[in-house]
From Swiss-Prot:
Disulfide bonds: none annotated. Together with RNA polymerase sigma factor SigO, positively regulates the expression of at least three operons, including oxdC-yvrL, sigO-rsoA and yvrJ. Required for the acid stress-dependent induction of the oxalate decarboxylase oxdC. The gene is rsoA. Transmembrane segments: none annotated. This is Sigma-O factor regulatory protein RsoA. Keywords: Activator, Transcription, Transcription regulation. Induction: Positively regulated by SigO. The keyword Membrane does not apply. It comes from the Bacteria.
Amino acid sequence: MDGQFEQKKKQKDETYDIEHLIACFSPMIRKKLSNTSYQEREDLEQELKIKMFEKADMLLCQDVPGFWEFILYMVDENS
């Protein structure tokens, strides 16, 4: 039961982190998009935010091995 709660909390924190990241980059995105035509700005801004969300989600959800797991993997690979 606690595992599900922790997983939901972690997922909620990751979503908040991604939303915060997008909010931080939004002014820069809007400034850069001022060089594009008015009709394309909203679409491009939305596409950029989608790409940022996808990449951040991929990076936050990766399972990175610990130091010793990595060492054991390298030893097994070289054997």
